[in-house]
Amino acid sequence: MAQRTRLGDILKPLNSEYGKVAPGWGTTPVMAVFMALFFVFLLIILQLYNRSLLVQDVLVDWRSLGR
């Protein structure tokens, strides 16, 4: 049998919603927006690294990182 602890009593309310699903789409649209923004961020970083997006006065060179 599991032993009750003070930490377990504190954390129990966090687990009380286990198995319950919010009706409808819930926060899925919000998650989709943040995923799209993160994708754009990664795309910009990749383009800067690949030099397909040139920004004035920004050097993308490994030697410039050692200065």
From Swiss-Prot:
The keyword Nucleotidyltransferase does not apply. It is a single-pass membrane protein. Keywords: Membrane, Photosynthesis, Photosystem II, Thylakoid, Transmembrane, Transmembrane helix. One of its GO terms (molecular function) is phosphate ion binding. GO terms for cellular component: photosystem II; plasma membrane-derived thylakoid membrane. PSII is composed of 1 copy each of membrane proteins PsbA, PsbB, PsbC, PsbD, PsbE, PsbF, PsbH, PsbI, PsbJ, PsbK, PsbL, PsbM, PsbT, PsbX, PsbY, PsbZ, Psb30/Ycf12, peripheral proteins PsbO, CyanoQ (PsbQ), PsbU, PsbV and a large number of cofactors. It forms dimeric complexes. This is Photosystem II reaction center protein H. It comes from Nostoc punctiforme (strain ATCC 29133 / PCC 73102). The gene is psbH.
